[in-house]
UniProtKB/Swiss-Prot annotation:
Alphabetical list of NCBIfam families matching this protein: rpoC_TIGR
Protein's UniProt name: DNA-directed RNA polymerase subunit beta'
Residues noted as binding Mg(2+) in the record, renumbered to the chain: D462, D464, D466
Binding site for Zn(2+) 2: C816, C890, C897, C900
Reaction(s) catalysed (UniProt annotation): RNA(n) + a ribonucleoside 5'-triphosphate = RNA(n+1) + diphosphate
Cofactor note: Binds 1 Mg(2+) ion per subunit.
Enzyme class of the recorded protein, top EC level: transferase
Molecular function in Gene Ontology: DNA binding; DNA-directed RNA polymerase activity; magnesium ion binding; zinc ion binding
Keyword presence, Transcription: yes
Species per Swiss-Prot/TrEMBL record: Neisseria gonorrhoeae (strain NCCP11945)
Domain of life of the organism encoding this protein: Bacteria
GO term, biological process aspect, one: DNA-templated transcription
Binding site for Zn(2+) 1: C72, C74, C87, C90
Quaternary structure annotation from Swiss-Prot or TrEMBL: The RNAP catalytic core consists of 2 alpha, 1 beta, 1 beta' and 1 omega subunit. When a sigma factor is associated with the core the holoenzyme is formed, which can initiate transcription.
Length: 1391
């Protein structure tokens, strides 16, 4: 044993301790001294002539250990035989020099010093404990004031501050009856004399007696800190330091450069400063120097220690010779370049290389081409081993030589070594897990790595100079995992949405499309063939062409009852190309999948179907064959682009003239004052938008058809073989929007701020642009480039926050047994089913039985995983909604259960235990982030036009139903006018399933009745898109109030038109203060001149005009129900700025309160209005029991309810963006989840990105993981504190078992950054953001990190508790428990 120890001196008993948790705390002076190997007394570092460390200095060999292995400083003892001897001459212990990396020293401070983290890291912990303000504590610490530490019998207060003059006056007055101190001594005295237990008692009593919210918060915070100290057994005065530990010298090296200069770590400067000041202070104290000098020196010492610990936290940062702030201990660990992110979470690895990538079109899916040079270097150890084994080399040195000479045997051995040894390829940025995949290397000449074209989509790689890194898995386990889990051919489906990610693109698509298109009257049309071989012969002898329509007998394979394949022969009418393609179909895939022109979407469906029907292996082989075929026919097709392919439609000139005429007409109307400037702009933009679309349509119609003569000599249309059209139509490259710019018109352009320039570019690229048009276009083009550069960083940051909040979420058990879940319905918007029910529930587990609505029988039992078969069955039976399990309601404590998560999207079956679903969710949401531009102009263009819809039409036949919020009145023309704010017309089909849902704005005229049968294309409602009306619900005679011209309303005369109208003036703009509160209103009188009241109440009808309203009625005018009183131009009330794209997603996940948030009803009840205050309206809701809830709303806000309306809790009452916190509070978790999922999906859908809902739900689960204790009961929590949901549940269960009162709690929603920082693991939080704050808090709380999450385990250098690491962690825990039980048993037997 001792012999072994000789060679392994560092692995003594203490080093290899198994540990299960890491605890952080504040070190006591004794602890610091116990770490130390000696006191550093001098600021010297090394002797500049001998380069030997000075004795007692910062690099002293006596304290920190020898500079050279097994050699003392003076050279008396050398070599291993003297190991452990301490030299009597120089005092150095003979041992390994690497102890200089771990031996610490210490500095005995002549005066105590406060630790800056506990002082300045907000909120100040010292301030909290002492209940003093930070300002006061600083005045004491930096010697500006005295603090009374012991008032004795005097009337002074403990902790009272005295200025110097005060102090001397009081001394004269009271003599030695009281104690007051300055500096850290004073603070330390206060801390030492504070009775923690007593203080806690007092605070708990105060907490119960006090009523004010702010006070409760303040006391609770103090209580938390004091209880933490009490619990952990740390003393308060340890926050003040007597002893300063010194970092081991090799961690702050000093390296001699040539020319007698030294490169040194900043820490040495900072330590030197501390030692100098400390020694000076010692000397001054010995000399009994005057007080003022000593004080100054103590203050300087405090400042020196401050900047050593955290430079720049207080006052100016200390700078070195180069005027840069010195890098202190705190800077070493925080930020991107700090210890956590640079060295612990991101290490560089050996056995890796990188090179440019190029295409390997002949590779199989699981292969990649690896340059021989790289392979030789990467696989060196394996080659050395083989050379020695085969006896070609006797030592490693000899083997090295052989490899360097590159003798022929080495290449043979390399081939052997590489066979079946997977390597991993990675392309930065690795945005999701498919950014690293394993391949089998094929040795190639040249220096570029060859990559299979089909995996490019997963890596987001192209061959314009991208580079990739290669890593070699060394151990057998690593090779096994690479092969089974990471091999490219095992990753066919995308983890984000479960669709194939190995989908052909570009040339391959074009080749397959060209091959499967049909041509009218091609050579040999109508021939019949006995089998595909005959078709081959005919094609090769040029009897038929690729597109020739023929009839052929094909053999297909169908599964019989026993599950075996049987051949079936069918006749098909098809084309030559499709018949040839049928040869590569896997067994069991029907021919009809390829019996059509294959576009990109179709090919994706084809591969998906193949995966579901034929399994992984056949699909991979099929994908490879598709690729080879596609490339082959793309080459044979020779499709190219010429300028003539961009055909400009003949109708263009006429369409442009028509649009110009319309614009001219609008301009005329504007001159006559019929429309406002804003309306004119909206309409002009609208006209040009429509004109652009019409031209595009004419152009596409023109491009997509060509006239040909068929066999009978008639002229017929067939789909065009225009190259540009084929590329766009197949989905290979380009889109209709791009072709529109090539040969239609470029259309409207956006300014950099997103607003649209109203003069469009009428030319296209083929005609060429004028200088002005070119100039207009540069705006948008440059913004695009600037955006791209900026948005990448934002996207990366979002992904980082998401990963951090979900990193510890792992599937840990099979089933948590809950029956909770969410009800899923199809997403219907406008007339379209955006996401069908089947897509939303596929791969979920049912939470309750699914029942057939017509027969009432159970279709699917609760707890069943819904496969494709089952969802199709549910779909056909007409079920409208299904309750499914969801991660948000999962009851598993630390992690998730497989049933609540459902199907693992990338594997197509129930998720395995150990799958890191949190990280996968974060990557799936973050990865497309780069594609979500900051509010792109596509949206800029679309938003302006969507606003101009003026009617809704039904898209399908069915029955119209009005939503529950629908309110309308009939006007005197008999039209139904909508007066509700959130009304919808829903259309149900014959079985009663919801097919469409249309929003109808306030003031729209309904053209259908509730329950009426309607036909597709029927108009449901119409309205004026450019103004918002104000409508009366009662009939009567108009009587104005507060209608003073020039005070509340202004007669506006349009400069251009000379017509005038009354417009309500903004209250802020009015001259006198009295008139600011006046609001122009309209009352209604009956024929006797009495004010009309709201039916059933005695409140008179009174409608206030909002600011900017143009009043359309006159005093004394008779009006009927549903008449328009005023119109509010839409241009002035701009449509709310829609935050789009990435910022919107970030806003949702950060749970930010939107500015100008809308308001939701707090309770269910009846609305009434109370007395108005200055600038605010008072809205009162009274519930059934007569309890009133009132709230003040500023007058600018648009109130959506009116007197006497009944509202439900959580219904919107004031217009504005919804605050997610309100939804959670008033409508509960399910409504909140539905809102966030819906809103996030909206953003991704606009970009055409598909993400499974469950990923968003996983993030929401983490945002809801903490709860607020409303009433602690007898659980030991503090009322008002936030705790982990799991801890709270556990505490409540325990309380109930013991018959105590459980805690009541309320759900709270945390943004992802907040949630990451509030995790139980301080290591994970500290490595994310705000390192200083997290560590300070953790140290005071004496926190223990259980190392449950992935990040903590990466940091301490363990396998992560996910995937194959989960079993490792579980077996470790079992071993531990076994050991613990054994020790317990032995103790029992001993007794």
């Amino acid at each position: 044993m001792n012999l072994l120890n000789l060679f392994n001196p560092l692995q003594t008993a203490g080093m290899e301790e198994e540990f299960d948790a890491i605890k952080i705390g504040i070190a006591s002076p004794e602890t610091i001294r116990s770490w130390s190997y000696g006191e550093v007394k001098k600021p010297e570092t090394i002797n500049y002539r001998t380069f030997k460390p000075e004795r007692d200095g910062l690099f002293c060999a006596k304290i920190f250990g020898p500079v050279k292995d097994y050699e003392c400083l003076c050279g008396k003892y050398k070599r291993l035989k003297f190991k452990g001897v301490t030299c009597e001459k120089c005092g150095v212990e003979v041992t390994l020099s690497k102890v200089r990396r771990e031996r610490m020293g210490h500095i005995e401070l002549a005066a105590p010093v406060a630790h800056i983290w506990f002082l300045k890291s907000l909120p100040s912990r010292l301030g909290m404990v002492l209940n003093m303000t930070l300002r006061d504590i600083e005045r004491v610490l930096y010697f500006e004031a005295f603090v009374v530490t012991d008032p004795g019998m005097t009337p002074l207060q403990r902790r009272q501050l005295l200025t110097e003059d005060d102090y001397y006056n009081k001394l004269d007055e009271y003599g030695d009856d009281f104690d007051a101190k300055m500096g850290a001594e004073g603070i330390r005295e206060l801390l030492r004399t504070l009775d923690v237990a007593g203080e806690i008692e007092i605070l708990r009593q105060e907490l119960e007696s006090t009523g004010s919210d702010t006070k409760i918060k303040k006391i609770a915070k103090r209580l938390k800190v004091l209880e933490a100290f009490h619990r952990s057994g740390m003393k308060l005065e340890w926050m003040i330091m007597d002893v300063l530990p010194v970092l081991p010298p090799d961690l702050r090296p000093l390296v001699p450069l040539d020319g007698g200069r030294f490169a040194t770590s900043d820490l040495n400067d900072l330590y030197r400063r501390v030692i100098n000041r400390n020694n000076r202070l010692k000397r001054l104290l010995e000399l009994h120097a005057p007080d003022i000098i000593v004080r100054n020196e103590k203050r300087m010492l405090q400042e020196a220690v401050d900047s050593l610990l955290d430079n720049g936290r207080r006052g100016k940062a200390m700078t070195g010779a180069n005027k840069r702030p010195l890098k202190s201990l705190a800077d070493m660990i925080k930020g991107k370049g700090g210890r956590f992110r640079q060295n612990l979470l991101g290490k560089r690895v050996d056995y890796s290389g990188r090179s440019v990538i190029t295409v390997g079109p002949y590779l199989r899916l699981h292969q990649c081409g690896l340059p021989k040079k790289m392979a030789l270097e990467l696989f060196k150890p394996f080659i050395f081993h083989k050379l020695e084994k085969q006896g070609l080399a006797s030592t490693v040195k000899a083997a090295k030589k052989l490899v360097e000479q590159e003798v022929p045997e080495v290449w043979d051995i390399l081939e052997e070594v590489i066979r079946e040894h997977p390597i991993m390829l990675n392309r930065a940025p690795t945005l999701h897990r498919l950014g690293i995949q394993a391949f089998e290397p094929i040795l190639i000449e040249g220096k570029a790595i060859q990559l299979h074209p089909l995996v490019c989509a997963a890596f987001n790689a192209d061959f314009d100079g991208d580079q990739m890194a290669v890593h070699v898995p060394l151990s057998l386990e690593a090779q096994m995992e690479a092969r089974t889990l990471m091999l490219a051919s095992n990753n066919v489906l995308s983890p984000a949405n479960g669709e194939p990610i190995i989908v052909p693109s570009q040339d391959i698509v074009l080749g397959l499309y060209y091959m499967t298109r049909d041509r009218i009257n091609a050579k040999g049309e109508g021939s019949l063939f006995a089998d595909v071989k005959e078709v081959h012969r005919a094609y090769h002898t040029k009897q038929v062409e690729l597109g020739t329509k023929i009839t052929v007998r094909l053999r297909e394979w169908v599964k019989n009852e026993a599950g075996e394949f049987e051949p079936v022969v069918n006749r098909y009418e098809t084309t030559v190309g499709r018949a040839l393609l049928s040869e590569i179909l896997p067994k069991g895939l029907p021919f009809e999948y390829v019996n059509k022109a294959l576009k990109k979407k179709e090919i994706s469906k084809l591969i998906n179907a193949s995966f579901r029907l034929c399994g992984l292996r056949d699909t991979v082989i099929f994908a490879d064959h598709l690729m080879y075929t596609g490339f082959g026919f793309a080459a044979k097709g020779g499709i190219s682009i010429a300028v003539d392919d961009m055909e400009i439609p003949k109708e263009k000139a006429a369409l442009l003239a028509e649009a110009n005429a319309e614009v001219k007409e609008i301009e005329d109307q504007y001159r006559q004052g019929l429309v406002t400037n804003g309306e004119r702009y909206n309409k002009v933009v609208d006209i040009w938008g429509r004109a652009g679309d019409k031209i595009a349509k004419a152009m596409m119609d023109n491009l997509s058809k060509q006239k040909v003569i068929d066999r009978d000599g008639n002229e017929v249309d067939q789909e065009s073989f225009n190259s540009i059209y084929m590329m766009a139509d197949s989905g290979a490259r380009g889109s209709a929007a791009q072709i529109k710019q090539l040969s239609g018109m470029r259309g409207l352009m956006a300014k950099p701020d997103g607003s649209i320039i109203e003069t469009p570019i009428t030319s296209n690229f083929r005609e060429g642009l004028t200088v002005l048009q070119y100039f207009i276009a540069t705006h948008g083009a440059r913004k695009g480039l600037a955006d791209t550069a900026l948005k990448t960083a934002n996207s990366g940051y979002l992904t980082r926050r998401l990963v951090d909040v979900t990193q510890d979420l792992v599937v840990v058990e099979d089933d948590c047994g809950t029956s909770d879940g969410f009800v899923m319905k199809a997403v219907v918007q406008g007339g379209d089913v955006i996401e069908a029910l089947r897509d939303r529930i596929l791969g979920r587990v049912t939470a309750s039985d699914v029942v057939d609505p017509s027969s009432g029988e159970t279709l699917v039992e609760a707890g069943t995983l819904l496969t494709e078969k089952l969802v199709d069955m549910i779909d056909q039976s007409g079920v409208d909604e299904v309750k499914v399990r969801t991660p948000i309601t999962c009851k598993t404590r630390h992690g998730l259960c497989a049933h609540c998560y459902g199907r693992d999207l990338a594997r197509g079956k129930l998720v395995n235990a150990g799958e890191a679903v949190g990280v996968i969710a974060a990557q799936s949401i973050g990865e497309p982030g780069t594609q979500l531009t900051m509010r792109t102009f596509h949206i800029g263009g679309a938003a302006s036009r969507a606003a101009a819809a003026s009617q809704v039409e039904a898209k399908s036949n069915g029955t119209a139903r009005f939503s529950s919020q629908m309110r309308y009145v009939a006007n005197n023309k008999g039209e139904l006018v909508v007066i509700g704010r959130s009304c919808e017309v829903v259309i149900h089909d014959d079985i009663g399933r919801e097919r469409e849902r249309h929003k109808v704005p306030y003031g729209a005229i309904l053209l259908v009745q509730d329950g009426m049968a309607i036909k597709a294309g029927q108009t449901l409602a119409t309205w004026d898109p450019h103004t918002r009306p104000m409508i009366t619900e009662h009939a009567g005679m108009v009587k104005f109030e507060n209608m003073e011209e020039g005070v509340t309303v202004a007669k506006q005369t349009d400069d251009v038109t000379g017509l005038s109208a009354l417009v309500v003036i903004d209250g802020k703009r009015r001259s006198s203060s009295a008139s600011k509160l006046l609001r122009p209103t309209v009352k209604l009188l009956d024929e006797n001149g009495v004010e009309i009241c709201i039916p059933g109440t005695s409140t008179p009808v009174s409608m206030a005009f909002p600011v900017g309203a143009v009043i359309t009625v006159r005093e004394g005018q008779e009006i009927g129900k549903g008449d328009v009183l005023a119109r509010i131009p839409q241009a002035s009330s701009k449509t709310r700025d829609i935050t789009g794209g990435l910022p919107r997603v970030a806003e949702l996940f950060e749970a930010r309160v939107p500015k100008d948030a809308g308001m939701l009803a707090e309770i269910t009840g009846t609305v009434s209005f109370g007395k108005e205050t200055k600038g605010k309206q008072r809205l009162i809701i009274t519930d059934v029991d007569g309890v009133a809830y009132e709230t003040l709303i500023s007058k600018e806000k648009q109130i959506l309810v009116h007197d006497g309306q009944v509202v439900n809790r959580g219904e919107t009452i004031v217009d504005g963006a919804v605050d997610p916190h309100d939804i959670l509070r008033l409508q509960g978790i399910e409504a909140l989840a539905r809102y966030i999922v819906q809103e996030v999906q909206e953003v991704y859908r606009l970009q055409g990105v598909k993400i499974s809902d469950k990923h968003i739900e996983v993030i929401i689960r983490q945002m809801l993981r903490r709860v607020n204790i409303a009433d602690a009961g007898e659980t030991g929590f503090i009322t008002g504190e936030q705790v982990e949901r799991g801890d709270m549940m556990a505490a409540n269960e325990k309380a109930l078992e013991e018959g105590k009162e459980p805690a009541r709690y309320e759900n709270i929603l945390l943004g992802i950054t907040k949630a990451s920082l509030s995790t139980d693991s301080f290591i994970s939080a500290a490595s994310f953001q705000e390192t200083t704050r997290v560590l300070t808090e953790a140290a005071i709380m004496g926190k223990q990190d259980e190392l449950r999450g992935l990040k903590e385990n990466v940091i301490v250098g363990r396998l992560i508790p996910a995937g194959t690491g989960l079993t490792y962690h579980r077996s470790r825990h079992q071993q531990w428990q076994g050991v613990e039980q054994e020790t317990a048993e032995t103790q029992v037997t001993d007794e």
